[in-house]
Amino acid sequence: MTTDEEIIIRLYQEMYSSMINKDRAELERIHDDSFVLFHITGMKQSKNEYISAIMDGTLNYYSAVHGDMEVAVNGDTARLTGKSKVTAAVFGGGKQTWRLQLDFELIRKNGEWYFTFAKASTY
């Protein structure tokens, strides 16, 4: 049996694969419609804005090597802090590798976990 923690970690890994592969359907599936992302700069994006930025090349992801991941589940909500070395070119900048930390909130609906909130920082 797979634990909620394992499912959430796998979801985090799937998210990065979907960002790299520009897989709109998977990105739509794993992010709740209420999803909001706060970038390192403080810029806020809704689910639709975020996915559109990946699809149109505003946010380009090339690889991600995952490090520490901490998950805390509380009933049908959870928090995940994931640390990954991410190679990306974003907002017209050059390709570089970032030590990116994402702090997530998730919700479980009908037995499935979805990202509802993310805040990016570096570590």
PLM features per residue range, with description:
Residues 2, 6-29, 34-123:
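A beta-strand edge to alpha-helix "cap/lid" segment located at domain peripheries
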